[in-house]
Amino acid sequence: MNGPHDLGGMMGFGAIAPEANEPLFHAPWEKRAMAISLAMGATRQWNIDMSRHAREKIPPGDYWSLSYYEIWIEGLLRLMNERHMLDGPPKALPRLEAQNVTPVLAKGSAYNRDVAPAPQFKIGDRVRVRNLQPTGHT
């Protein structure tokens, strides 16, 4: 998938100039956006890959006009809409109780996956690559 979220693979944008002493949050609402995203993740209605894909599906014109945390909220809204969580009566979902937030975040979550076949190449092998521009998720 080649889109605005893939700046590392897009031509013509130049180097990213990091903001000196950039704060983690530029405004109070950004803290809440992050907290809501984490809280909704605790409902176990999607995984980290589904969450990332929801953000990657944002149309480029919309994506370019959104800030970092607006992108997270837009992705969250997409996930919730896909699961009909915003219409009809509230559904009973798993919750993360306040006293458990810090230990759960400190523990993190699994992101490793077993790889069934052995890798085809090893470090130092010469390979030939193609510049593909896939339209879907890779």
What are these regions (language model features)?
Residues 1-96:
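N-terminal intrinsically disordered, low-complexity, charge/repeat-rich segments that act as generic
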